[in-house]
Amino acid sequence: MPKTVANTKPMDVLKNALSRNVLIDVKGNREYSGILEGYDVYMNVVLQNASEIINGENKGVFDRILVRGDNVIFVSPSKGDNE
């Protein structure tokens, strides 16, 4: 039986996105796109092979990056990765 939005918890979304591509929007018109390696209850997230995007322009690639949770606006699993 498919889950409905009403019974989906935020941490479940992150758990299901582990080892998958995600897009993270953060304060300051920045985004990070990469493979979700880990997270905690404070929304601190670790990405592998992460691209930093500022104002729509790719500014660099990181092997591994930690994004501090208090800067996170949203986390979105990439299309096709939302099972």
Swiss-Prot record:
Recorded GO cellular component terms are: ribonucleoprotein complex; Sm-like protein family complex
Q: Which UniProt keywords apply?
A: Ribonucleoprotein
Short name of one Pfam family: LSM
Q: Name one GO biological process term.
A: mRNA splicing, via spliceosome
Q: Which PROSITE patterns match?
A: SM (PS52002)
Name any one GO molecular function: RNA binding
Q: Which Gene3D superfamilies match?
A: 2.30.30.100
Source domain of life: Archaea
Q: Which InterPro entries match?
A: Lsm6/sSmF, LSM_dom_sf, Sm, Sm_dom_euk/arc, snRNP_Sm-like_arc
Sm domain segment(s): 9-81
Q: Tell me the protein family, please.
A: Belongs to the snRNP Sm proteins family.
Tell me the protein's name.
Answer: Putative snRNP Sm-like protein
Q: Can you name the source organism?
A: Thermoplasma volcanium (strain ATCC 51530 / DSM 4299 / JCM 9571 / NBRC 15438 / GSS1)
